[in-house]
């Protein structure tokens, strides 16, 4: 049986909020089987829990934000969720003492490191996968995103930026998902932005925590970061990273093919909502063995049952 996963014990880190520029403390704790990912605002009295559900993604400008019915939000969840998805973690409690997840270095890599350092624990319940049975597609002008039936989890992703640096890079990528491929090829790709936009955002009290420490910054002609890029195709890889995180609010690892052209947070969430609303387009399945399972997550070292 392929089992559900959580973290072995609590792990904590401190970072900066991208939009506020303030210090943010993040804790990741083990959670019971079938509880999914639940985020908790510990800076509020009493603390407020927000489950990671597609219908609670109510803000997608520059990030993905969960907002409950009282308007309480937790923003910038996508990089953390990409790490959770990439390592196959089904259940976790995410505590944060601010309205946003810390941006860390702008990628999923610090979260992957945290999760691997504390250890991953298999739980005594079968892992559920969301298998795509019918094509689901949403469009917005020339942008589109689609999920199709497929035996594993495959990504076919294209971006289209006219900036000279991005235009010279590879703007298309195909990959077969596995935890090892995610960690090696995707997790270190950083968010990117343009100097002209950053100046405007700061003038409007946004992106106050943004810097070259947590983003690839471009002027009109070049990358401004002294160390350059981590991957030659870091731009398309970061968009794939974002999509991994955005898709994980479906609540399960996806078995299917994800195809995208110029998509972003809003379109990704529309796709998840459209998928879940069409109940004959998907099914939940479990698998007996790693060989049988179509999506490969690395086996946690020293796994124990809870």
From Swiss-Prot:
<dbReference type="GO" id="GO:0103117">
    <property type="term" value="F:UDP-3-O-acyl-N-acetylglucosamine deacetylase activity"/>
</dbReference>
<dbReference type="InterPro" id="IPR011334">
    <property type="entry name" value="UDP-acyl_GlcNac_deAcase_C"/>
</dbReference>
<keyword id="KW-0441">Lipid A biosynthesis</keyword>
<dbReference type="GO" id="GO:0046872">
    <property type="term" value="F:metal ion binding"/>
</dbReference>
<feature type="binding site">
    <location>
        <position position="242"/>
    </location>
    <ligand>
        <name>Zn(2+)</name>
    </ligand>
</feature>
<keyword id="KW-0378">Hydrolase</keyword>
<keyword id="KW-0444">Lipid biosynthesis</keyword>
<dbReference type="InterPro" id="IPR015870">
    <property type="entry name" value="UDP-acyl_N-AcGlcN_deAcase_N"/>
</dbReference>
<feature type="binding site">
    <location>
        <position position="238"/>
    </location>
    <ligand>
        <name>Zn(2+)</name>
    </ligand>
</feature>
<comment type="pathway">
    <text>Glycolipid biosynthesis; lipid IV(A) biosynthesis; lipid IV(A) from (3R)-3-hydroxytetradecanoyl-[acyl-carrier-protein] and UDP-N-acetyl-alpha-D-glucosamine: step 2/6.</text>
</comment>
<dbReference type="InterPro" id="IPR020568">
    <property type="entry name" value="Ribosomal_Su5_D2-typ_SF"/>
</dbReference>
<keyword id="KW-0479">Metal-binding</keyword>
<feature type="active site" description="Proton donor">
    <location>
        <position position="265"/>
    </location>
</feature>
<dbReference type="GO" id="GO:0009245">
    <property type="term" value="P:lipid A biosynthetic process"/>
</dbReference>
<comment type="similarity">
    <text>Belongs to the LpxC family.</text>
</comment>
<keyword id="KW-0862">Zinc</keyword>
<comment type="function">
    <text>Catalyzes the hydrolysis of UDP-3-O-myristoyl-N-acetylglucosamine to form UDP-3-O-myristoylglucosamine and acetate, the committed step in lipid A biosynthesis.</text>
</comment>
<keyword id="KW-0443">Lipid metabolism</keyword>
<dbReference type="Pfam" id="PF03331">
    <property type="entry name" value="LpxC"/>
</dbReference>
<protein>
    <recommendedName>
        <fullName>UDP-3-O-acyl-N-acetylglucosamine deacetylase</fullName>
        <ecNumber>3.5.1.108</ecNumber>
    </recommendedName>
</protein>
<dbReference type="GO" id="GO:0016020">
    <property type="term" value="C:membrane"/>
</dbReference>
<dbReference type="InterPro" id="IPR004463">
    <property type="entry name" value="UDP-acyl_GlcNac_deAcase"/>
</dbReference>
<feature type="binding site">
    <location>
        <position position="79"/>
    </location>
    <ligand>
        <name>Zn(2+)</name>
    </ligand>
</feature>
């Amino acid at each position: 049986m392929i089992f559900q996963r959580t973290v072995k014990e609590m792990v904590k880190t401190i970072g900066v909020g991208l939009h506020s520029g303030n210090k943010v403390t993040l804790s990741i704790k083990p959670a019971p089987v079938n509880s999914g990912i639940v985020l908790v605002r510990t800076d509020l009295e009493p603390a407020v829990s927000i489950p990671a559900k597609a219908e609670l993604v109510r803000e997608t400008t520059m990030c993905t934000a969960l907002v409950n019915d009282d308007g309480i939000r937790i923003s910038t969840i996508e990089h953390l969720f990409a790490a959770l998805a990439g390592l196959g973690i089904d259940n976790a409690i995410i505590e944060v003492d601010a309205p946003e997840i810390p941006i860390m270095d702008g990628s999923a890599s610090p979260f992957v490191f945290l999760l691997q350092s504390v250890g991953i624990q298999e739980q005594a319940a079968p892992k559920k996968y969301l298998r795509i049975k019918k094509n689901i597609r949403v469009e917005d002008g020339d942008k589109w995103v689609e999920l199709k039936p497929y035996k594993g989890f495959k990504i076919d992703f294209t971006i289209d930026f006219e900036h000279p640096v991005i235009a010279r890079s590879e703007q298309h990528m195909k990959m077969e998902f596995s935890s090892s491929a995610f960690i090696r090829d995707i997790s270190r790709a950083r968010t990117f932005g343009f100097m002209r936009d950053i100046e405007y955002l700061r003038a409007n009290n946004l992106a106050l925590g943004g810097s070259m420490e947590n983003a690839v910054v471009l002027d009109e002609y070049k990358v401004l970061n002294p160390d350059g890029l981590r991957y030659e195709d870091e731009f398309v890889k970061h968009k794939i990273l974002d999509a991994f995180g955005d898709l994980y609010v479906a609540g399960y690892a996806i078995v299917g093919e994800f195809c995208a052209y110029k998509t972003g947070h809003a379109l990704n969430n529309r796709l998840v909502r459209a998928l879940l609303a069409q109940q004959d387009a998907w099914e939940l399945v479990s698998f007996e063995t790693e060989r049988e399972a179509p999506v490969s997550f690395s086996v946690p070292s020293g796994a124990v049952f809870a």
